[in-house]
């Protein structure tokens, strides 16, 4: 079995030699799914996992735009259409200088499993550009988004591929993208999710990834007769996911003591309460400032430049920033400091060494493909509402989100429970996500 796993990983490395993030994501899945395939004959034909690791389509394109000084700038755009076995491609757009083929393929591959776990009919995809919205004027962002959509509109559609936001793509960018699609195609359809409420967006969509992550952590804690109430929580990031994860933690009686951005992290031992969180939301969403400004408003807090928050003592850790932000040494520090639960809000924020240590330590650890699936689940609910030309209330959407996260947790427990009763959520999420897609691929033939 070990040889089969290694042979598969070697094949992936050979075909994708300059794509470390993609290789990392596929390796993590292969280590748990290949042993499952070996025990289940129906999945041994047709090279299912190998086909899942090969995108159905990759589109790469030039994005020229003009800045405010009249200079022409050129960026590179992408759309990875990974797998459509269970529904139209679904996955976010990321605008960040680090964006490349490896990162987007890893995100698209993860998205296939994540979307499968939601039980909604959505395939997996991802896209973006190496454009940095930071420091750009609204008009510059608009011109970039319009140029980006000129090419993207060729490959998306309400029943083909429905993108959403991700890092660097929030409500402003989605609005510009949607507006230009409408102008180019002369049609008002649900080709993007994360839209504003006034033009087809869903209530709870902005909150969904953060809320869903906390709901998943809540479910894990219940398996050990624990609650969020009274727990100290360390959160990384200060964007959409981190903000609403913090909001839900506060609603459930937890104490949030850190948030961060690419410059460093703030530690507020007194706790980030509702008023302080409101300040952070305004700072990040409206003023587009840096988290370091928090300590100017609240001097009792400390700012740690160039550092990550994992040395801060806590009961629960929610990594909500970006991939590979939590390494093996930091995982050891968290566990030795008494952390009992880690629930990933970002995509693959823990390195393989960190994941291995969490699982070996038998703490509660949720991989992002399960714990942050609330965002895409609510995107799926937005697609449903767009199709019906109807809107559900906040309570209805939140109840559906809560139910979906409960179902994902249940699926992880079903496939991840070990002989000693310990739940390996990594194994559970990978196998549960694989089974639905594999069944659909087997039914549809070699395509």
Language model region names:
Residues 20-23, 41-46, 119, 156-165, ...:
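Flexible, glycine/charged-enriched surface loops at secondary-structure junctions
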Residues 193-196, 201-313:
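Glycine-rich phosphate/diphosphate-binding loop of Rossmann-like nucleotide-binding domains
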Residues 42-73:
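Structured beta-strand/loop patches that form or line metal/cofactor-binding pockets in enzymes
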Residues 61-122, 126, 130:
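Phosphate-interaction motifs
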Residues 264-365, 370:
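Rossmann-like adenosine-cofactor binding region
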Residues 2-26, 220, 335-447:
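Adenosine-phosphate binding glycine-rich loop
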Residues 96, 115-229:
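Glycine/serine-rich phosphate-binding loop and adjoining beta1-alpha1 elements at the start
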């Amino acid at each position: 079995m070990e040889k089969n796993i290694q042979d598969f990983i070697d094949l992936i490395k050979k075909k994708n030699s300059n794509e470390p993030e993609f290789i990392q994501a596929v390796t993590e899945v292969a280590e748990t799914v290949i042993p499952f395939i070996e025990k289940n004959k129906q999945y041994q034909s047709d090279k299912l996992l190998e086909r899942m690791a090969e995108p159905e389509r990759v589109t790469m394109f030039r994005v020229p735009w003009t800045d405010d000084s009249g200079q022409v700038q050129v960026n590179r755009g992408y759309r990875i259409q990974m797998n459509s076995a269970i529904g139209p491609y679904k996955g976010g757009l990321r605008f960040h200088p680090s964006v490349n083929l490896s990162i987007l393929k890893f995100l698209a591959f993860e998205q296939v499993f994540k979307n499968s776990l939601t039980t909604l009919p959505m395939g997996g995809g991802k896209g973006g550009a190496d454009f940095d919205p930071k420091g750009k004027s609204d008009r510059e962002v608009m011109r970039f988004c319009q140029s980006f959509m000129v090419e993207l509109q060729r490959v998306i559609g309400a029943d083909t591929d429905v993108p959403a936001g991700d890092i660097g793509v929030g409500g402003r960018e989605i609005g510009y993208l949607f507006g230009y699609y409408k102008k180019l195609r002369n049609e008002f359809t649900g080709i993007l999710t994360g839209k504003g409420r006034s033009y087809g967006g869903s209530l709870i969509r902005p909150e969904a990834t953060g809320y869903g992550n906390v709901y998943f952590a809540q479910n894990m804690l219940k398996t050990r007769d624990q609650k969020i109430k009274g727990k100290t929580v360390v959160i990384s990031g200060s964007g959409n996911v981190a903000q609403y994860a913090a909001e839900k933690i506060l609603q459930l009686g937890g104490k949030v003591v850190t948030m961060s951005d690419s410059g460093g992290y703030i530690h507020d031992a007194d706790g980030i309460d509702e008023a302080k969180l409101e300040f952070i939301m305004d700072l990040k969403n409206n003023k587009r400032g840096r988290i370091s400004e928090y300590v100017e408003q609240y001097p009792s807090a400390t700012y740690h430049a160039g550092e990550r928050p994992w040395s801060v003592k806590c009961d629960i850790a929610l990594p909500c920033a970006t991939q590979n932000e939590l390494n093996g040494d930091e995982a050891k520090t968290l566990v030795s400091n008494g952390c009992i639960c880690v629930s990933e809000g970002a995509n693959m924020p823990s390195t393989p060494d960190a994941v291995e240590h969490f699982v070996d330590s038998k703490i509660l650890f949720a991989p992002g493909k399960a714990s942050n699936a609330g965002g895409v689940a609510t995107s799926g609910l937005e697609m449903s509402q767009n199709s019906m030309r109807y809107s559900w209330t906040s309570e209805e959407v939140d109840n559906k989100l809560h139910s979906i996260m409960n179902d994902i947790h249940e699926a992880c427990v079903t496939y991840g429970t070990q002989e000693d009763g310990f739940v390996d959520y990594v194994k559970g999420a990978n196998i549960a996500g694989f089974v639905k897609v594999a069944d659909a691929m087997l039914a549809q033939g070699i395509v």
